[in-house]
Amino acid sequence: MLSFDYSIPTKVFFGKGKIDVIGEEIKKYGSRVLIVYGGGSIKRNGIYDRATAILKENNIAFYELSGVEPNPRITTVKKGIEICRENNVDLVLAIGGGSAIDCSKVIAAGVYYDGDTWDMVKDPSKITKVLPIASILTLSATGSEMDQIAVISNMETNEKLGVGHDDMRPKFSVLDPTYTFTVPKNQTAAGTADIMSHTFESYFSGVEGAYVQDGIAEAILRTCIKYGKIAMEKTDDYEARANLMWASSLAINGLLSLGKDRKWSCHPMEHELSAYYDITHGVGLAILTPNWMEYILNDDTLHKFVSYGINVWGIDKNKDNYEIAREAIKNTREYFNSLGIPSKLREVGIGKDKLELMAKQAVRNSGGTIGSLRPINAEDVLEIFKKSY
């Protein structure tokens, strides 16, 4: 296990009715707020009305940025920055899932950057100051409610990039599982796949000896496997929604990657799919993951897949190691299929003509390779894309 520094300062208010705290919490940072949200579901399910009522009760002025895309775009970020500057906003409040929160993070950082915001996304060292950020979570998926990363798309350049800064962690986040009762089944499925993929990225590391972190990762994966199906079948099951919501936060808030390197595999590949074809992130990850697993399985990586098969899927440890590994990968594929997620890239509109270009793009920002357990290059990525097609 590598050395590390540990600090996850986001304050979490978890449970039914926890939205009531936002007035007092926001007033610690000021009295002018930008609310950032997506397509309007928060108005239909009452969250918007409750949040704005609390703001009014506490004499907090608020402004709005709606219409944040599922893959939030830099053009939308720039609109939010202008609203903040024009109204001297003190805090950015995201109400929604990872898209709204990611958009809010880059707005909050961009307020203090005088150049082109996209340049700041490409080079996070340009971030010098960030407005306070808070979130009210309505979708269990990205874990953005507790981490310092945002992912933003530029449709003009076909780029989807991650940007991070310690001050981009939300000051506080409200996690009320009842707010996810109305999430459609397809979004629940994609969100569950996203949580599992975040966990896989830390779990399948080339760094050995992080026993505690791996044990937590295995528990999160078992949680997703159990409660993802339950949440699909009974959308208002509180325990299912609560466990998925907490798993979402723990999967990517930094805990699982402590003492490990942070060289991810499937996310850089999927970001290219989303950048060019604007597909649902979790769907792309679910398609790629089993094929990536099959591709990197060899004598050197076998031990990790054996642990995964035994500790997550409960496969008999007395079986042959390769049999355990292949059964674990097969179970992963079948689980995503059971959630109703497409299994082929062609099913979600990906064109064959761009596979080679996207493979090269996937490794361009990481020295030509991605991944930790078994690093892969552009040629490897192309083969995984072909296997997934």
UniProtKB/Swiss-Prot annotation:
Homodimer. InterPro entries: ADH_Fe/GldA, ADH_Fe_C, ADH_Fe_CS, BDH-like. SUPFAM superfamilies: Dehydroquinate synthase-like. One of its GO terms (molecular function) is alcohol dehydrogenase (NAD+) activity. Pathway: Alcohol metabolism; butanol biosynthesis. This is NADH-dependent butanol dehydrogenase A. Its EC number is 1.1.1.-. The keyword Membrane does not apply. It comes from Clostridium acetobutylicum (strain ATCC 824 / DSM 792 / JCM 1419 / IAM 19013 / LMG 5710 / NBRC 13948 / NRRL B-527 / VKM B-1787 / 2291 / W). One of its GO terms (biological process) is 1-butanol biosynthetic process. Primarily NADH-dependent, although some NADPH-dependent activity was observed. Belongs to the iron-containing alcohol dehydrogenase family. Keywords: NAD, Oxidoreductase. It comes from the Bacteria. GO terms for cellular component: cytosol. Pfam families: ADH_Fe_C, Fe-ADH. The keyword Phosphoprotein does not apply.
